[in-house]
Amino acid sequence: MAENTQNPAAGTAPAKPKPAVPGAAKPAAPGAAKPAAKAPAKPAAPAATAPSGVYKPPVDRPDPNPFKDSKMSGVASWFQERFYVLNPIIDYMKHKEVPKHRLSFWYYFGGLGLFFFIIQILTGLLLLQYYKPTETDAFSSFLFIQGQVPFGWLIRQIHAWSANLMILMLFIHMFSTFFMKSYRKPRELLWVSGFILLVLTLGFGFTGYLLPWNELAFFATQVGTEVPKVAPGGAFLVEILRGGPDVSGETLTRMFSLHVVLLPGLVMLVLAAHLTLVQVLGTSAPIGYKEAGLIKGYDKFFPTFLAKDGIGWLIGFALLVYLAVMFPWEIGVKANPLSPAPVGIKPEWYFWAQFQLLKDFKFEGGELLAIILFTIGGVVWMLVPFLDRQASQEKKSPMFTIFGLLVLAFLLINTYRVYDSYVLHLPK
């Protein structure tokens, strides 16, 4: 039998207690309250991060509308609460100043040009209600406006006269700006945008001249669109403008679309840029006036200068109505492409100087030479602010003053020559 080696007392001996684990909780005494369960610790809130994961510190943003509790009148407060974002612009205009000196009078012609442009838009919209841009109906629609529409004759006359006055004001504004050297640094782009506005305005005059579809306008357009043919690529452009080899009903519709759609849109864009530059850059005094003490003070642009500008607008409107009533433009007779051209065909007065130069250059290649001279002269005139380095340094530049006088003399003398030949002494 195998020997039993186990200790008989081994089954009854108590087991030794295990040593306590450091940090372990002790058992609660009998009857003692159970300790509260420890809530799990919340993780720390992550720092504010952008969607890309870049940390951005919190920003204390002010009330987006600090004027909502304004104590102004009810109407003013209502508008101020909704258009408060414009307040910085209004404050800027309140602090904007215009220098006063003996030549300040010339500052108002730019505003008059803008006023007559607004008149053009308003009267043009009224005329559009009745005008029909077709070869068969254009002239008769003018007769209807003139004779049947209430005050239609007055609207047409105001539209015609405001177009001429607008161009006249722009010429005066351009030359007064030139001789005061207001184009100098940093106003170069102000001059360039003004020159572009003048060119677009002349385009208004050229495209609107044909719209009555009378005999004089028809043959003047025929002659005027012949001139660019001598230039390289000119024949192609003329055919696009005319809608064919000759002036026809297609030409009328194309002139109409240019006059009421394309040119107004371009003028609005350039005019917005021009007026913005005027506000940002301010009004310039002639060279040396500040140093010589010739500036008598400054007018607040708002409301003082604008109030004076408004007085000029009222005077301009009175002159416009007087001319429209006392010196009405005639309608003439309906255009007949098969009839011979009448005696004394000429463009509008603002093209007379160029028209006279074309007449003077009757030799072979003369028309092309005249076009080249017009183009070079226009480019040089537009780039004057960049060419006149002395004016940019606040120094007088007599050479450019002489250049401006020569240009003005060319325009005035040739304009008078056409007036003398075609108005005063036109053979009957």
From Swiss-Prot:
* Cell compartments where the protein resides: Cell inner membrane
- Tell me which GO cellular component terms the UniProt record holds: plasma membrane
Report biased composition (Low complexity) as residue ranges: 21-51
Q: Which GO terms describe its molecular function?
A: electron transfer activity; metal ion binding; oxidoreductase activity
Which cofactor does the UniProt annotation name?
A: heme b
Q: Does the keyword ATP-binding apply?
A: no
**Known InterPro entries for this protein?**
Cyt_b/b6_C, Cyt_b/b6_C_sf, Cyt_b/b6_N, Cytb/b6-like_sf, Cytochrome_b_N_euk/bac, Di-haem_cyt_TM
Q: Would the keyword Secreted turn up in this protein's UniProt record?
A: no
Q: Name one GO biological process term.
A: respiratory electron transport chain
- Span list, region Disordered: 1-67
Transmembrane regions listed in the UniProt entry: 108-128, 160-180, 191-211, 258-278, 310-329, 367-387, 399-419
Its main localization is membrane
Where do the annotations place heme b b566 binding? 173, 274
Membrane topology reported for the UniProt record: Multi-pass membrane protein
* Keywords of this entry: Cell inner membrane, Cell membrane, Electron transport, Heme, Iron, Membrane, Metal-binding, Respiratory chain, Transmembrane, Transmembrane helix, Transport
More info: Heme 1 (or BL or b562) is low-potential and absorbs at about 562 nm, and heme 2 (or BH or b566) is high-potential and absorbs at about 566 nm.
Function according to Swiss-Prot or TrEMBL: Component of the green S-bacteria bc complex, which consists of the Rieske protein and cytochrome b subunit but appears to lack a cytochrome c1-equivalent. This complex has a comparatively low redox potential.
Q: What is this protein called?
A: Cytochrome bc complex cytochrome b subunit
**Which species is the source of this protein?**
Chlorobaculum tepidum (strain ATCC 49652 / DSM 12025 / NBRC 103806 / TLS) (Chlorobium tepidum)
Q: Upper lineage ranks?
A: Bacteria, Pseudomonadati, Chlorobiota, Chlorobiia, Chlorobiales
